[in-house]
A protein has these predicted regions:
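S-adenosyl-L-methionine-dependent methyltransferase catalytic module, highlighting the catalytic core
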Residues: 2-3, 7, 21-25, 67-173
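Conserved class I S-adenosyl-L-methionine
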Residues: 11-20
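A short beta-strand-loop structural module common to alpha/beta enzyme folds
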Residues: 18, 35-41, 129-132
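Adenosine-cofactor binding site in Rossmann-like domains, unifying the SAM/SAH pocket
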Residues: 26-52
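A conserved beta-strand element that flanks and buttresses the S-adenosyl-L-methionine
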Residues: 58
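A short His-aromatic
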Residues: 61-65
């Protein structure tokens, strides 16, 4: 919430990639108006309609679930984004649910990889933050998590050239 408040103070209008979730409610409680996607597959539907009053598009732990996040990032009609992704850890395998095919990580990025993806899709990174996810469990991996960044947040703005092409409809892939 801290980074969101820094890059887009309330009251503001947020378009959050992903279905309504507990964080959507927290944003509302902090005086943000929040729109969410409706649960559609964002790999297939990367040309979504974003309301004109939106100040910022957010995606919290969403892009790792896409086979290819590039078309979504390239085509999204927004000027500003705030995204978070899990960082690939050398001591843990990527997450996959055995029961829910939508709850699987196709990607866990190293920060430089995510930066390159954003830059290639027409975004200029303005601010970055990292944080840890310590566990109260006992063991080697929980101990390593106390000292290892697990999540990466990026605030970016669309580059001028990319903005012009996106709003002319020239980016569809």
């Amino acid at each position: 919430m801290k980074m969101l408040k820094e890059v887009c103070p309330s009251p503001s209008v947020i378009f959050d990639l992903g279905v309504r979730n507990p964080f959507s409610e927290i944003m509302k409680q902090n005086n943000y108006k929040v729109y969410n996607t409706g649960g559609e597959d964002l790999d297939d539907n990367h040309e979504m309609e974003i309301p004109d009053d939106v100040d910022l598009v957010t995606g919290f732990e969403i892009l790792e679930h896409l086979v290819s996040p590039y078309p979504l990032l390239k085509n999204i009609k927004a000027n500003r984004i705030l995204l978070t992704v899990p960082i690939k850890l050398w001591f843990a395998k990527a997450y996959k649910s055995e029961t829910d095919p939508l709850d699987r990580h196709y990607h866990e990025f190293e920060p430089w990889q995510f930066d390159w993806l954003l830059e290639k899709s027409g975004w200029k990174i303005i601010k970055k933050e990292y944080w840890k996810n310590p566990s109260k469990k006992f063991g080697i991996r929980p101990l390593l998590r106390k000292f290892t960044n697990r999540y990466y947040a990026v605030y970016a703005e669309r580059t001028k050239e990319s903005y012009t092409n996106c709003y002319k409809g020239e980016l569809n892939l």
